[in-house]
Amino acid sequence: MKWKGLLFTVLMIAMLILSACGQDASTPATGKSKESDTSEKKLKIGLSVSDLTLERWQHDRDFFVDKAEELGAEVIVQSANGDEAKQLSQIQNMLSQDLDALVIIAINSDSLTTVVEQANGEGVPVLAYDRLINGADIAAYVSFDNVRVGEMQAEYLVNLQPSGNYFLMGGSPTDNNAKMFREGQMNIIQPLVDSGAIKIVGDQWTKDWDANEALKIMENALTANKNDIDVVVASNDNTAGGAIQALDAQGLVGKVLISGQDADLAAIQRIAEGKQTMTVYKPIEAIATKSAEVAIQLAKGEKVTSDTTVNNGVIDVPFIQLDPISVGKDDIMNTIIADKFHTYEDVYKNVPESERP
């Protein structure tokens, strides 16, 4: 009997030990499964693009999506095609899709406060891409030194034509960058205006950066000044393209200096052909990939650091600032072609082979 009692006791102890071991083994397994679910969850980033009908933003989208996907994120892209109300609606729609971060290329820098507040309320950090968003608590801003862009445009033109009649063709009046470009342009031009060397014979902003609007503005400016314009300070390539159509109708292409920005293919072709004087190349791959990297950081809840900040009327926003590049006819090969931004064949397709570099 004693032997049977002892055996029963040993069996009970063994069962208790096995039961305890089973509980210990199952608890970590459950915890590991949760960690696995978290680590395997793909980050979701919303990219609100101002206008994909413009070539410039198509490049940005492609580079951004490629980099974000390489880093393991899913990207939802929507384009407002220049419509402010549509951009607001699209952003609200994206916020309903469980985003981890939101990246906005703003149409109107001053109209996004409400949707940024909504994003913040839902725990979705907002990154301003290329265009600063004013009056809102955004997490970061990635762009080029836009004042420097304007300075580069004016410097290039002033070096070639330090006196004469200048017409200022600004960008969209609702785009904060357009104002920064103008600030940079006037840093260079104003001293020459003050000295009497340069006369500003017109100054207009171009709604939505629209080429057709720029064409009309330039036609009216030429009429008002009896074609006596030496330089057009156009703030981007799209507006430059519209202005050049008006100049062409008056036989002034290649005679009137004109700036641009973005290094659109059509603009680089015009520069190669001698129709446009210069553009400012903002390496799109650089801003797109950097923005994707910053968006991933924000999506993971990581802090973004920067060397400088910019005040948007509410906070000092961490500003990741990139350097632009001035491009004239002699610079195309070692910038645009070297970076494979456009191909040699595309750029020089309208230039006789004997005149190609």
Regions found by a protein language model. Give the residues of each.
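Short, surface-exposed loop and linker segments with low hydrophobicity and enrichment for Pro/Ser/Thr
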Residues: 8-9, 232
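Bacterial N-terminal signal peptides that target proteins for export
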Residues: 1-8
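A residue-level marker of the well-folded mature domains of exported/periplasmic proteins
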Residues: 3, 22-357
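C-terminal motif of bacterial Sec signal peptides marking the signal peptidase cleavage site
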Residues: 17-20
